[in-house]
Amino acid sequence: MQKNITKVSDTEQELEIILTAEEYGTEYNQELDEAKRTIQVKGFRKGHVPTGLIKKLAGPAIEASVAEKMASKHFGTIVDEEKIKPASRAQIESVSYEGDELKIKLSYEIHPVFELNNYSDYTFTKARYTITDEDVQKEIDLILKGHGSLATVDEAALGTDTVIGDVEKLDAAGEPEEGGKTENHHFNLEYLPEDNPFRISLEGAKAGETVNVATTQKDPNTPVVSYRITVKEVKRLELPELTDDLVKEITRQRFETVADFTADVRIQLEEHFGMKSDEELLESISSKLIEENPVSTPKSMVASFANMLVENAKRQFGGKFPKGFDESQFTESIIPNAEKHARWLLISQKIAELNNVEVTDEDIKTYAEKEAEKSTPEQKEEIMSTYQSTEFRDYIADTIIKDKIYDIIKSQVTITEEPTPVPVHKA
């Protein structure tokens, strides 16, 4: 067997495999014998069709099948011998039988060979979110909202109130349009953007007052649409007093006192924003390394990530995009993001390779134990068993490798912490 490898680009190669009749003959004869047994030709008994006629009728199909099997057989061996890292399946580009030789040309994508730029002098800032008593109270108030009640107030509407009013659409002369009235429309101001014209006009309004609202359009050529709202009622959410009994109800007996519940809310906030801080740091790290290492990305790898992003977007719409949604245009728009994902995969694999990162059975066990600690005693044994099962091993191993890679990077760069207030919750 002869082999000729040609570099097409940083991520593409062609491989020519040349086999002698002795090397592919056994497979060819097996295919020919199978054709003799199965092909029926009028005038000949089954299995007794002359070889020459069989070759004439089924020759091209036999040759194609033999070439495919030979390519599959030898490609893996050559990949191992030449230490090739394929990024896609090999495709047969051409097949030729010349004399006693079979020539097969394959094309495929590979992981690019590149040197990783030194990142030891990089500096990153990590947010250290500070949880205050006010943050804890705000979170508790959000929980209590589900147990509150709306009460009518004879006051100017606040940005958190609900305004009920009759809405009339106005014509160009400022008069109500026929059929353009909606009665008892509820405006929940808290859930309207701060720059929403309805929120701006209704904040501060009281029952019995009338306000005018002019909505601007994105298209400057589209005329302004005006409305008149007669405020009939302002409702304000009244939160219940947090008592031990309410705590028991809210938490289904998990906590019995306000103090214990409040302490848990703080712990949950600290854990949440601790994870948020880690995620933001890792995003900064990956973005910097991607920027500093413009590695060529195999098209198949980019396509795989693009497909993943499309499927993730579909799930947000309940499994499929709404009618009229241009999926092809959306897919095209996320290609740059898919390229970043592919580039980061290549960079992280390079870091793992340079640092001999591997996952041991002990790593799997430790990870499973850590996850099991988050569950109830009854679930721990099941979680330990599941996480160490063959079905979950690849997934867990991938997670552990990612964590190890980030730990390696963090140990080699400079990270400074910066006290950061908790972001304002936007409803």
From Swiss-Prot:
One of the protein's GO biological processes: protein folding
Domain PPIase FKBP-type residues, every copy: 160-240
One Pfam short name: Trigger_C
Keyword line: Cell cycle, Cell division, Chaperone, Cytoplasm, Isomerase, Rotamase
UniProt KW Cell cycle keyword: yes
UniProt keyword Chaperone present: yes
GO molecular function: peptidyl-prolyl cis-trans isomerase activity
Similarity comment: Belongs to the FKBP-type PPIase family. Tig subfamily.
Record remark on domains: Consists of 3 domains; the N-terminus binds the ribosome, the middle domain has PPIase activity, while the C-terminus has intrinsic chaperone activity on its own.
Name of the molecule in the record: Trigger factor
Lineage: Bacteria, Pseudomonadati, Chlorobiota, Chlorobiia, Chlorobiales
Gene name linked to the record: tig
